[in-house]
């Protein structure tokens, strides 16, 4: 059977000399892995993580790993390789997708979101965009946070906390008696114009990390590329 789609290469693993297994996040078919062969400098340039490609997958049976052929649409490597913030954010993003999405499970809307994120990242690293990516990823996997209004009083102002149980924002008045049991809601997530402090970065990463650990990172197993991004971000403010 054949599958033809557009995709982003998110992993590449050596099988033997000049032969690799690539994992591609495709628009209409989700994650697919296939064997590719590199025999030229051109093909080595095509099969790089982050490249947007035309992806052709062929196998006798659907459950087989299959062979893959790719044509390059766009490469982001040059934009990320010389900037650590961009590179670590990129590595974290593709590693999270590989870790949290199941093989051959469609995420077409999220694919478009990813392409837009990579395009913006190629121009400029923005911490707000990165956290919004993690929040979107949580939502895509079934764990959406509601930060638009208080989960109890429904007010839309003075939102300070997030409930770890309901994943909803809480106002200062509602949350104050329970503040030691609540997560902090970073101010920058409520306003596109506010500057982001180091403390708010810590709060934002703690927020998404809590829900990743609770629902998605089994046995509290962390994604190494994400940890590298966090360490770099918090130590290079």
From Swiss-Prot:
Q: Does the keyword Ribonucleoprotein apply?
A: no
The entry's cellular-component GO terms read: bacterial nucleoid
Can you supply a Gene Ontology BP term from the record?
A: double-strand break repair
Top-level taxonomic group: Bacteria
UniProt-listed Pfam families: RecO_C, RecO_N
Transmembrane is among the record's keywords: no
Keywords from the named record:
DNA damage, DNA recombination, DNA repair
Function, as annotated, reads: Involved in DNA repair and RecF pathway recombination.
User: Record's family?
Assistant: Belongs to the RecO family.
Query: In its UniProt entry, what is this protein called?
Result: DNA repair protein RecO
């Amino acid at each position: 059977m054949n599958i033809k789609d557009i995709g982003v290469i998110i992993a590449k693993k050596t099988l033997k000399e000049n032969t690799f297994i690539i994992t591609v996040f495709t628009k209409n078919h989700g994650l697919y892995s296939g064997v590719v062969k590199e025999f030229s400098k051109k093909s080595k340039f095509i099969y790089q993580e982050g490249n947007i490609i035309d992806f052709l997958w062929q196998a006798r049976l659907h459950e087989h790993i299959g062979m893959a052929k790719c044509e390059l649409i766009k490469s982001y490597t040059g934009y990320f390789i010389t900037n650590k913030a961009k590179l670590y954010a990129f590595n974290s993003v593709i590693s999270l997708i590989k870790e949290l999405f199941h093989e051959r499970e469609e995420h077409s809307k999220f694919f478009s979101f990813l392409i837009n994120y990579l395009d913006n990242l190629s121009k400029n690293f923005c911490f707000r965009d990165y956290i919004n990516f993690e929040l979107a990823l949580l939502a895509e996997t079934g764990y959406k946070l509601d930060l638009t209004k208080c989960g109890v009083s429904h007010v839309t102002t003075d939102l300070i906390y997030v409930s770890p149980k309901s994943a909803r924002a809480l106002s200062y008045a509602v949350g104050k008696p329970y503040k030691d049991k609540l997560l902090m809601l970073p101010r920058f997530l409520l306003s596109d114009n506010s500057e982001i402090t180091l403390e708010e970065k810590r709060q934002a990463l703690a927020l998404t990390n809590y829900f990743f650990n609770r629902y998605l990172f089994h046995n509290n197993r962390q994604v190494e590329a994400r940890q590298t991004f966090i360490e770099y971000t918090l130590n290079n403010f």
